Amino acid sequence: MLTNNQLLKHSRIKKKKQSYNFYTKPQIKGLCIKVFTRTPKKPNSALRKIAKIKLKNKKEILAYIPGEGHALQDHNFVLIKKGRVQDLPGIKYKVIRGVLDTIGVLNRKSSRSKYGTKKII
C-alpha cells in the first residue's frame, strides 16, 4: 500500500496487457518472412520448425509450425493463433495448418482437426 506522499511523487504503475499483437482477436493473418529451425530447452533434443511472420498490424513475431513436414516458404500467407510451445522459450504463437497457404499434415489419422487434414475415405 502506498502512502499519500509516495503517490504525490510517483503515480501508480499500470499493468501491461498480455499480448498487443492480437488484442481481442482469436486469430490473425500474417505474411511469412523466413522459415528456420531452432533447438529446444535442455532435456529435449530436436529441430523445431519456426517461422518469422509479419502480421497485418506491421509487427513481427516468431511462430511454431506444428506437425510433421510443411511446405511453408517465404511470402506465404498464414493464419496465427495464440499458444506457447513448452520447450521453446520466446515462442508464444502457432501456425494454423490447412488454412490459406499452409497445407495440412499428410496421411494423418488421429487428431486431424489440429493439423488441418481432411478425412480419408
Curated annotation (Swiss-Prot):
The keyword Metal-binding does not apply. It is found in: Plastid, Apicoplast. GO terms for biological process: translation. One of its GO terms (cellular component) is small ribosomal subunit. InterPro entries: NA-bd_OB-fold, Ribosomal_uS12, Ribosomal_uS12_bac. Transmembrane segments: none annotated. CDD domains: Ribosomal_S12 (cd03368). Keywords: Apicoplast, Plastid, Ribonucleoprotein, Ribosomal protein, RNA-binding, rRNA-binding, tRNA-binding. With S4 and S5 plays an important role in translational accuracy. Located at the interface of the 30S and 50S subunits. Belongs to the universal ribosomal protein uS12 family. Part of the 30S ribosomal subunit. PANTHER family: 30S RIBOSOMAL PROTEIN S12 FAMILY MEMBER (PTHR11652). This is Small ribosomal subunit protein uS12c. The lineage of its organism: Eukaryota, Sar, Alveolata, Apicomplexa, Conoidasida.
